[in-house]
A protein has these predicted regions:
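Phosphate-binding site recognition
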Residues: 1-456, 471-472
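Structural signature of nuclease core domains in nucleic-acid processing machines
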Residues: 435-556
Length: 556
């Protein structure tokens, strides 16, 4: 059979029946049920690490309403024959996802939650017609289905539905909740900008999950997924036999994401072993517990691209699946001295940091340690060493893909913190031909922003372009002019003036003067000013950079 890629597949049965490649993670079923005493299990992983597909697989395996023998045929779990006889398709399963329960107001989010509960009720509509079900429960069930239930009944809804399922099937219910923390994550974000509904949303979820998880005689066990663990005191109050597994824990560490061996098998099946090193450079590097893993979303997207174009280049598939709010928070907090740490990370170094996986959303921004913890839990950073344990660990950027997010996002965010008065001072000096003042101001700006890539020339070019943008000028970067490409061209049409800048990176501080001269000579020799007709004043500058120092020279 030809190799088929499933990108973003979350329906396990469809994935298997369509013949698309599946990285076998079914052994988690046995380990979870037979090798733990957990009544409630929480797995926290970054977005796009296969949590939803995992939960859908569990639903297909356990659900009493399915016959799943065909779709599990040949998978690892079938080696445990006694386990499969005891558990496969033997339990009612209540599976709900909160992935889309997010809005800008409590009312909007609550409405979405009602809709998700209504969808679940429609999936189980047959329960409403069962005479074995308590009449009062049927009444609430109908109100849930038509989104007219009282808030108190919404908070009790999961337990009510589970009680109805138990009445019909005579078996305890397996509860699966995917992306449990999305509603409160969004609520916390909106509360931070003056729309406070975090406490209201938390109260609803605490009631909804608390009644389902605490002292519920109809619960066989529950599995929950999310990005962050919310402290037990905050939402899992009173839950017995509760265990959570984050990116710091060794147990279950290889079940989310692709291991190196799994990627090797995958590339062999795809006949693309030639891309192993490139995929490793771009998408590997995450350390979960004691396992090194790749991001499955990225690997499958890239393999899909390679099927369409044999020489497709790897790119950033992850950046549009996760917002950068936590990075913005870091940069805006002037009381956090993080610029130096970001520079170390972006230059492929490591930082030592105290981290915790036991957080509450309303206190995420209360300390620098918490924010580094969030970057770790959400996949922006990873442990530097799989053998490290404890709360103090070395952190690094996992791979080239995430490094590109830092370069695109963090550097720009720090640039945005440069106030307009500093930009204006720089422009005044340049328009006035004040080389000394321009050198000083540009050097000062360099000290305020992030440097990376060992101060490559591209870094300085991007720095200048970023500073000039937003000042009301037309900014052209590396556009063809004359016989070559000037680094920066500014046009001030209102005042009929223009500026050409050529930037050089100096290898030594004592080379800066001659590098400035070389930059000015390049402007002249390559006729960068040709074509700038109608401007009454054209300034031409060579700027040499050495680390965080700038030297400016004007063409006389």
């Amino acid at each position: 059979m030809a190799f088929r890629v499933g990108v973003g597949e979350t329906d396990f049965a469809d994935l298997r029946r369509s013949g698309k490649y599946y990285v076998d993670k079914t052994e988690i079923l046995y380990e979870l049920v037979e090798e733990t005493e957990n009544k409630v299990t929480l797995f926290t992983r970054p977005r796009r690490f296969g949590k939803t597909l995992m939960m859908n697989m569990m639903s297909n395996f356990f659900s009493i309403r399915k016959d799943s023998r065909e779709i599990f045929e040949g998978l690892r779990i079938t080696k445990h024959k006694a386990f499969c006889e005891k558990w496969m398709n033997q339990c009612p399963v209540l599976f709900i996802s909160f992935k889309d329960v997010e809005a800008e107001t409590f009312e909007g989010a609550y409405k979405m939650l009602q809709t998700r509960l209504a969808d679940v009720c429609k999936e189980w509509e047959s329960l409403y017609k069962e005479e074995r079900v308590n009449a009062a429960d049927r009444k609430v069930f109908k109100e849930l289905m038509f989104e007219t239930a009282k808030e108190s009944d919404v908070r009790s809804s999961l337990k009510i539905i589970m009680r109805m399922m138990h009445a019909v099937y005579g078996r305890k219910v397996i509860l699966l909740i995917d992306e449990y923390d999305v509603p409160i994550a969004r609520a916390n974000e909106m509360s931070a900008v003056g729309n406070p509904f975090y406490s209201a949303m938390l109260a609803v979820l605490r009631g909804l999950m608390g009644t389902a998880l605490k002292d519920n005689e109809f619960l066989e066990f529950a599995v929950i997924t999310g990005c962050l663990r919310i402290a037990k005191e905050s939402i899992f109050t009173g839950t017995n036999n509760f265990s959570s597994y984050s990116v710091l824990d060794e147990d279950f560490s290889g079940f989310f994401g692709f291991t190196g061996d799994e990627v090797t098998e995958l590339l062999l099946a795809a006949d693309r072993e030639d891309k192993a090193e490139m995929i490793k450079e771009w998408y590997d590097g995450y350390v979960f517990g004691d396992s090194f893993v790749y991001c499955p979303w990225d690997v499958m997207n890239y393999l899909s691209a390679l099927k369409k174009r044999r020489n497709a280049k790897p790119k950033n598939y992850w950046k549009n699946t996760s917002h950068n709010g936590v990075l913005l928070t870091f940069v805006k907090r002037t009381d956090f001295k993080v610029k130096g740490k970001f520079e170390i990370l972006m230059n492929k170094g490591t930082i030592i940091q105290t981290v915790s996986d036991d957080l509450t959303y309303d206190t995420l921004h209360s300390s620098e340690d918490h924010l580094w913890s969030v970057l770790l839990m959400t996949g922006y950073l990873t442990k530097a060493d799989e053998k490290e344990e404890g709360e103090t660990v070395r952190l690094r950027i996992p791979n080239r893909e995430i490094a590109s997010i830092f370069e695109d996002t963090v550097v720009e965010l720090f640039r945005q913190t440069i106030d307009n008065s500093a930009r204006k001072s720089m422009m005044d000096a340049l328009w006035n031909g004040d080389e000394q003042e321009a050198s000083k101001v540009i050097s000062d700006l360099l000290w305020r922003t992030i440097s990376y890539n060992d101060y490559h020339e591209d870094y300085y070019h991007a720095f200048l372009a970023g500073v000039f943008v937003g000042l009301g000028y037309e900014v052209e970067s590396n556009r063809e002019k004359g016989l070559g490409r000037p680094d920066i061209l500014l046009k001030d049409d209102d005042n009929r003036r223009a500026m050409i800048i050529e930037a050089k990176r100096s290898m030594k501080e004592e080379d800066m003067d001659q590098d400035c001269d070389a930059a000015v000579s390049q402007i002249v020799n390559k006729k960068y000013a040709d074509g700038l007709c109608g401007y009454t004043r054209i300034r031409c500058y060579g700027i040499a950079f050495f680390q965080k120092h700038a030297r400016v020279k004007r063409m006389q």
